[in-house]
């Protein structure tokens, strides 16, 4: 009996030691779904075959966790969806769906926040109608008979990013930096985009 109690005490002490030696960084980066899976991109918009390794390597070298955000477009419109601008996608139903996904994402941040895990940033995809951060897109001639659409890049967040920021503010949670990689702008090279992100992460 004495031996059993001694073994149980040793097990408790061993567990406490492991907890003290916990290696987690207490830092996490929330990453736009398609940056971790190019298969989620709308057709003809993927610049990489799988994940955007050059970007994920930067995050992993810092020792930070990566939380993959949902892709509202893929879930709502499907994998074989047409290209679309923010003005085309911004229906009451799709915005409500984005808000639901924003609430789920905010739950992660809220739970992390309670135990001291910091969301370093939200990494979006500039030029996306849903996950753009500083720039989204707009189609002047959307709707009606199928045709070639005239695409414009305009300042502002995509629908999901708007709803996520709004949800965090409504919960009085810390709002992390929203950082946009210009992967859907096609004005900068992939190398330039990666270098800009690398410099940003140096200070994080």
Please describe what each predicted stretch is.
Residues 32-35, 70-73, 125-129, 135-136:
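Short loop/turn segments at strand-loop or loop-helix junctions that form parts
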Residues 41-52, 145-157:
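Glycine- and acidic-residue-enriched helix-capping/strand-helix junction motifs
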Residues 121-142, 149:
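Internal, conserved structured core segments that host functional sites
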Residues 30, 66-70, 118-125, 177-182:
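A structural signal for short, well-ordered beta-strand segments and their strand-loop junctions
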Residues 1-45:
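Active-site and ligand/interface coordination hotspots across diverse enzymes
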Residues 7-10, 15, 24, 62, ...:
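Divalent-metal-activated hydrolytic enzyme cores
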Residues 45-89:
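Short, surface-exposed acidic-centric catalytic microdomains
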Residues 38-39, 76-78, 128-134, 186-189:
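Short catalytic/ligand-binding loop motif for oxyanion handling, primarily in non-cytosolic enzymes
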């Amino acid at each position: 009996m004495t031996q059993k109690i001694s073994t149980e005490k040793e097990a408790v002490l061993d567990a406490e030691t492991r907890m003290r030696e916990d290696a987690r960084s207490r830092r996490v980066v929330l990453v736009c779904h398609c940056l971790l899976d190019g298969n989620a991109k709308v057709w003809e918009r993927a610049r990489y075959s799988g994940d955007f390794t050059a970007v994920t390597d930067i995050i992993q070298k810092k020792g930070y966790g990566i939380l993959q955000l949902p892709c509202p477009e893929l879930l709502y419109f499907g994998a074989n969806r047409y290209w679309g601008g923010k003005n085309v996608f911004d229906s009451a139903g799709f915005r409500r769906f984005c808000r639901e996904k924003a609430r789920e994402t905010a739950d992660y941040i809220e739970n992390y926040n309670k135990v001291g895990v910091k969301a370093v940033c939200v990494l979006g995809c500039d030029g996306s109608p849903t996950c753009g951060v500083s720039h989204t897109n707009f189609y002047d001639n959307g709707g009606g008979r199928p045709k070639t659409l005239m695409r414009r890049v305009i300042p502002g967040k995509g629908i999901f990013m708007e709803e996520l920021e709004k949800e965090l503010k409504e919960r009085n949670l810390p709002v992390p930096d929203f950082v946009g990689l210009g992967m859907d702008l096609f004005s900068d090279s992939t190398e330039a985009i990666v270098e800009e992100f690398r410099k940003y992460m140096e200070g994080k």
